[in-house]
From Swiss-Prot:
Highest taxon, organism lineage: Eukaryota
Family assignment from sequence similarity: Belongs to the TFIIA subunit 2 family.
GO terms, molecular function: RNA polymerase II general transcription initiation factor activity; TBP-class protein binding
Annotated localization: Nucleus
Keyword field: Nucleus, Transcription, Transcription regulation
Protein name (database record): Transcription initiation factor IIA subunit 2
Length: 113
């Protein structure tokens, strides 16, 4: 059985734009709802597959306070406050940040070198 893909990236600008476009197509009866769902599933699979290889930007951060954390279904969620963010070009501060970290290994890879 194939591992389900995280739907985390549907909340990105790209994911939201794709969803809105598909909703418009379904609303105009240009495509059926079932095709829209298949396209979003394909987006989930593709983005989860390609990002580990193509995304190379790194951001450093320092938070003054860890407000909450949770680990459920191989997903860590952290809520931190008073954060100083820095990358190679610029930096800034934010009052509150939610960090979601998903397990990057498939079930068969865990524990294997």
């Amino acid at each position: 059985m194939e591992k389900p893909n995280y739907q985390l990236y549907r909340n990105t600008t790209l994911g939201q734009a794709l969803q809105k476009t598909l909703d418009d197509f379904v609303g105009d009866q240009m495509i059926p709802d079932s095709l829209s769902k298949k396209i979003m599933d394909s987006f989930d699979k593709s983005i989860n597959k390609i990002l580990p290889h193509k995304a190379k930007n790194k951001v450093n951060f320092r938070a003054d306070k860890l407000r909450a954390y949770r680990y459920c279904d191989n997903v860590w969620t952290f809520i931190v406050e008073q954060i100083d963010l820095r990358d190679a070009v610029e930096g800034g501060t934010v009052d509150r940040l939610k960090i979601v970290a998903c397990d990057g290994q498939t079930k068969g890879q865990i524990g294997h070198a």
